Design a protein with these regions (language model features):
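Conserved Class I SAM-dependent methyltransferase catalytic core
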Residues: 30, 42-52, 250-255, 318-352
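Non-catalytic, mostly N-terminal accessory regions of nucleic-acid modification and defense proteins
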Residues: 1-204, 270-281
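Extracellular loop and loop/strand-boundary signature of outer-membrane beta-barrel proteins
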Residues: 182, 314-316
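A generic secondary-structure signal for well-formed alpha-helical elements
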Residues: 51-64, 176, 226, 230, ...
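Generic recognition of stable, solvent-exposed alpha-helical segments in well-folded globular domains
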Residues: 19-22, 26, 44, 48, ...
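Conserved S-adenosyl-L-methionine
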Residues: 183-292, 297-301, 306-310, 344-347
């Protein structure tokens, strides 16, 4: 009998630790109603991001409040920016939104919060979703989602909000990708694939580039790898090596997800929006490491307009399939001793 009880306790503990994101997803998915997964992901992920920056802000705000007698000003934006924390104006703070979650105007209040954050933080300009007031979004459900996200526990110092919420953000990305089927692959590469590429390349230091970065999974995993191997990375045990992140994403809504995904992890990166073939936003970049999962067998990539491009050192790629163009773009952006790891469709390296 005691053994059974112990097993039950162990099972509960495991469920609480391992299944936390899954339980949260089940509850959030139940609130989706008839909304399409592709649309719903921006509603939920935008709110998770808002919760993250508000949590980080409130933690710093409390510390400044405690030091007010020494001259600290909790309402000075520079006090936050000096610590790489986003300034959150009063109308965007989570406590304010949570208190108004049951009001019919909650959609407009969230939109106003997003506008205020972008206004006061230029790095987020054009990144945050601002369509929570639209009529098709049920405001009762929106309030329930806010209540649900409010219950995400930050815990002790080892699992601060950016770690817990980062895990939740990534898990939700994977679930939305699964719900969207083949289309979901445009913004999410399975974690096991990303982890394999990163562990093969070991990007401890230097420039890391992803020319089709989706929601920035390659970069998140690269930084996690560095942190996990901090003691043996030849960098004095620092969790972040001398690593610079560069990426590009052609889909605007996916680019926004990428920017939020990096910000929620506290990662700086130069992530550009634009068509990598026709508007290479990092034309002079020579990277030490390139990780990528390009879209497979794209036929309408406009190759006929790039016949004389300097990137085609090993021959002009076929206009009807972009696979070989991706390979040459990657090789073009590598330093002579650089290393690349990328995923291609079956038969890409043996096709004519």
């Amino acid at each position: 009998m005691n053994k059974q009880k112990n097993n039950a306790k162990s099972s509960d503990a495991t469920s609480a630790n391992v299944g936390y994101e899954a339980k949260l997803w089940q509850m959030a998915d139940a609130l989706r109603g008839s909304m399409d997964a592709a649309e719903y992901k921006h509603v939920v992920l935008g709110l998770i991001f808002l919760k993250y920056i508000s949590d980080a802000f409130e933690e710093r705000h409390a510390a400044l409040l405690a030091e007010k007698q020494k001259g600290a000003d909790p309402e000075d934006p520079d006090e936050y920016r000096a610590q790489s924390i986003f300034w959150v104006p009063p109308e965007a703070r989570w406590a304010h939104l949570k208190a108004q979650a049951k009001q019919s105007t909650i959609g407009q209040l969230v939109d106003d919060a997003m506008v205020g954050i972008e206004r006061d933080n230029p790095a987020l300009k054009g990144v945050l979703p601002k369509d929570y007031a639209r009529p098709v979004l049920d405001k009762t459900r929106l309030g329930q989602i806010i209540d649900l996200i409010s219950n995400i526990k930050v815990g002790d110092e080892a699992s601060r909000s950016k770690d817990v919420l980062g895990r939740v953000y990534e898990y939700f990305l994977s679930q939305f990708a699964s719900a969207e089927g083949k289309k979901g692959g445009e913004f999410y590469t399975p974690r096991c694939v990303v982890k394999l590429l990163v562990e093969m390349l070991e990007p401890y230091r230097g420039r890391v580039y992803d020319p089709c970065c989706g929601s920035s999974g390659m970069f998140v995993q690269s930084v996690e790898f560095i942190r996990a191997h901090a003691k043996g990375n030849g960098n004095g045990g620092k969790a972040r090596a001398d690593i610079s992140i560069y990426g590009q994403e052609s889909n605007y809504t996916t680019w926004r997800l990428a920017k939020m995904n990096l910000a929620i992890r506290g990662i700086d990166g130069q992530i550009a929006h634009g068509d990598t073939f026709h508007n290479d936003r990092h034309p002079d970049l020579k990277a030490d490491f390139i990780l990528a999962n390009p879209p497979f067998n794209v036929s309408d990539w406009g190759g006929e307009r790039l016949r004389d491009d300097k990137r085609w050192k090993y021959g002009v790629p076929p206009a009807g399939n972009a696979n070989f163009a991706w390979v040459q773009h990657i090789v073009h952006h590598l330093v002579p001793a650089g290393v690349a790891g990328f995923v291609l469709a079956n038969g890409s390296m043996s096709s004519n």
